[in-house]
């Protein structure tokens, strides 16, 4: 993945999360396991910076799903979980999520959070099916209140007008 080679105009990398799940119902689970293993190996190694030092990249964020097949109880993919733990001990990531708990809370469904740790509130379509993908999550919005205050030049009415304008952009 080459997400870390992309930059915005202010020097930020795109906020991307990789949801690393080994689903027994996935017909390509073994191939998926190879991909998850390689992503973890690359993260464990780190990315070489300008000084030649391997550092921990902030993105993509990694979320590793613990399930019956990889929860260190003799499952087929326990070796990948051990790699994930090594990776976390050195690079702070991946974060972990329990498929068992998600299934309990969401009628058997397991799905990725958006961005860092933001979960959309549950929503079902007209057929009563959960819809987790393709939905928008605005997430966190920052407002620069000191800037609004400076622009208002002490005029409380102008402050509230500017604040209302900025808030309108948020949604």
Predicted regions and their residues:
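Conserved catalytic cores of very large enzyme subunits
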Residues: 1-171
